């Protein structure tokens, strides 16, 4: 068995070359992988799993558990397309993802009950789905597919028909602030996973029905609307007070991404032009709002330099979803590819900061590092590069593994909104304060964006 020290040395030896900036040829896979290698080095700099006393699968604060899910999804793609012969990298990714699966293998580890929401579980589900669709090294006990099915089943079981006519709440646990808030990203993750599982397994009865249920609810509640110009607008969410009628008017790239790619998966699987139309509408809305001069930006906060740590990572999932959409709905490829190329070139030029000379920044439009750094900057840069070389995801029909369990997760208590864990009053109070801060940032965002 490889020791922690050996793993650390091996991974560091991957990146011994000295580089002061990243050059990238967007038409050359080797060039993209070469640049991405240094971005991945920056990701590992934040990793706690190689540090003495650190937690396997987690990244340094202020990054949350869900940020780790973002990172590992991109690392699976980097391994698959750029370094599939690197056994050290393979073990690091495998150990990190498997270690965070939780006691019931549904990505609800009890030690994350103070912060984990439905969206967090969903993001990890998306990461594990990357492993499924890339035939990444399988665990012996529970397959990646079984674990994604457990994520889907536990999320779907929390569908709350008693408030706002349906939908998922933001939070899983009743003691977390934000439990009274329903948001688009949580429901988007459920929609997205349903679409991917439908295509992968070939089973339409449960998964397509769930995707259609989520889409209809999003329209009915007013979280997803069509504007006069035909573009789709996806709002952040609303408190359940007054039937979710007071909608928070904030738009985030990753929310658009999960719905966009979900529609593309459904179109690819069903052949129904309704899903192609919806894909095209979200693509057009995304191109209109989240790009300036073809360069990707988190428009709701970035131009004002107001993005928080979470928001600075949203383009990670957005980029991944754009890449997947080009493969599943080829009709969108030319439009998306153009902006991905420009954004990847800008991201590479931003990766020219820090003491290593390749630390990535937030602003991809200025041809240099902007002084901003963090895990989100690294994962976003990685994903926009990987989106250029992504290949069609596997399914059971095209060579994917089929260790499936359609009932996975249904026998645990984690599918309930009220989870009976032994939590102290002090822990609940701390969780409430922590989540309240995040909710305040979301709901208060519209105020500072005016100025």
From Swiss-Prot:
Q: What induces it?
A: Induced by caspofungin. Expression is also regulated by SPF1.
- For whether the record's keyword set contains Manganese, the answer is no
Q: Which GO terms describe its biological process?
A: budding cell bud growth; carbohydrate catabolic process; filamentous growth; filamentous growth of a population of unicellular organisms; filamentous growth of a population of unicellular organisms in response to biotic stimulus; fungal-type cell wall biogenesis; fungal-type cell wall organization; regulation of filamentous growth
Residues with covalent lipid (GPI-anchor amidated alanine) sit at 429
Which residues does the annotation flag as glycosylated? Answer: 86, 111, 135, 203, 243, 268, 402
Know the name of this protein?
Mannan endo-1,6-alpha-mannosidase DFG5
Changes after translation: The GPI-anchor is attached to the protein in the endoplasmic reticulum and serves to target the protein to the cell surface. There, the glucosamine-inositol phospholipid moiety is cleaved off and the GPI-modified mannoprotein is covalently attached via its lipidless GPI glycan remnant to the 1,6-beta-glucan of the outer cell wall layer. N-mannosylated.
Q: How does the entry describe its membrane topology?
A: Lipid-anchor; GPI-anchor
Gene that specifies this protein: DFG5
Query: Known Pfam families for this protein?
Result: Glyco_hydro_76 (PF03663)
Q: Disrupted gene: resulting phenotype?
A: Leads to decreased caspofungin sensitivity.
Location of the protein in the cell:
Secreted, Cell wall; Cell membrane
Task: Provide the E.C. number(s) assigned to this enzyme.
Answer: 3.2.1.101
Q: Does the keyword Repressor apply?
A: no
Which family, according to UniProt?
Answer: Belongs to the glycosyl hydrolase 76 family.
Q: Mind listing the GO molecular function terms for this protein?
A: mannan endo-1,6-alpha-mannosidase activity
Which reactions does this protein catalyse? Answer: Random hydrolysis of (1->6)-alpha-D-mannosidic linkages in unbranched (1->6)-mannans
Prosegment residue ranges: 430-451
- The residues the entry assigns to the signal sequence are 1-21
**What is the enzyme's main class?**
hydrolase
UniProt keyword list: Cell membrane, Cell wall, Cell wall biogenesis/degradation, Glycoprotein, Glycosidase, GPI-anchor, Hydrolase, Lipoprotein, Membrane, Secreted, Signal
């Amino acid at each position: 068995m490889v020791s922690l020290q050996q793993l650390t040395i091996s991974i560091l030896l991957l990146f011994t070359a000295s580089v002061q900036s990243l050059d990238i040829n967007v038409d050359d896979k080797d060039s993209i992988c070469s640049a991405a290698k240094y971005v991945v080095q920056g990701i590992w700099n934040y990793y706690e799993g190689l540090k003495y006393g650190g937690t396997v699968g987690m990244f340094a604060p202020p990054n949350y558990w869900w940020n780790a899910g973002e990172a590992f999804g991109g690392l699976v793609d980097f391994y698959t397309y750029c370094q599939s012969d690197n056994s050290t990298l393979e073990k690091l990714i495998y150990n990190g993802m498997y270690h965070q699966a939780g006691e019931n293998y549904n990505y609800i580890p009890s030690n994350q009950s103070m912060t984990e929401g439905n969206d967090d579980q969903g993001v990890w589900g998306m990461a594990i789905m990357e492993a499924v669709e890339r035939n990444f090294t399988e665990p012996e006990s529970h397959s990646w597919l079984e674990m994604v099915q457990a994520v889907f089943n536990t999320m779907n079981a929390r569908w709350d028909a008693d408030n706002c006519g349906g939908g998922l709440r933001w939070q899983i646990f009743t003691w977390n602030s934000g439990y009274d808030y329903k948001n688009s990203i949580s429901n988007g993750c459920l929609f997205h996973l349903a679409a991917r599982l439908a295509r992968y397994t070939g089973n339409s009865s449960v998964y397509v029905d769930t995707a259609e249920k989520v889409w209809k609810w999003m329209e009915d509640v007013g979280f997803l609307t069509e504007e006069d110009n035909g573009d789709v607008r996806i709002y952040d969410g609303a408190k359940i007070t007054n039937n979710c009628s007071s909608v928070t008017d904030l738009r985030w790239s990753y929310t658009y991404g999960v719905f966009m790619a979900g529609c593309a998966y459904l179109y690819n699987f069903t052949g129904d032009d309704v899903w192609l139309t919806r894909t095209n509408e979200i693509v057009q809305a995304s191109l209109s709002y989240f790009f300036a001069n073809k360069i990707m930006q988190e428009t709701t906060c970035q131009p004002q330099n107001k993005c928080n740590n979470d928001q600075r990572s949203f383009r990670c999932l957005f980029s991944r979803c754009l890449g997947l959409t080009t493969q599943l709905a080829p009709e969108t490829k030319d439009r998306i590819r153009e902006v991905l190329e420009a954004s990847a070139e800008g991201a590479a030029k931003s990766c020219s900061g820090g003491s290593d000379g390749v630390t990535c920044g937030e602003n991809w439009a200025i041809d240099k590092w902007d002084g901003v750094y963090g895990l989100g900057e690294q994962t976003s840069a990685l994903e926009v590069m990987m989106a250029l070389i992504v290949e069609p995801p596997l399914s059971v029909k095209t060579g994917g593994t089929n260790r499936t369990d359609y009932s996975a997760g249904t026998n645990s208590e984690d599918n309930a909104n009220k989870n009976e864990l032994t939590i102290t009053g002090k822990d609940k109070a701390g969780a409430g304060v922590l989540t309240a801060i995040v909710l305040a940032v979301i709901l208060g965002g519209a105020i500072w964006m005016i100025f």
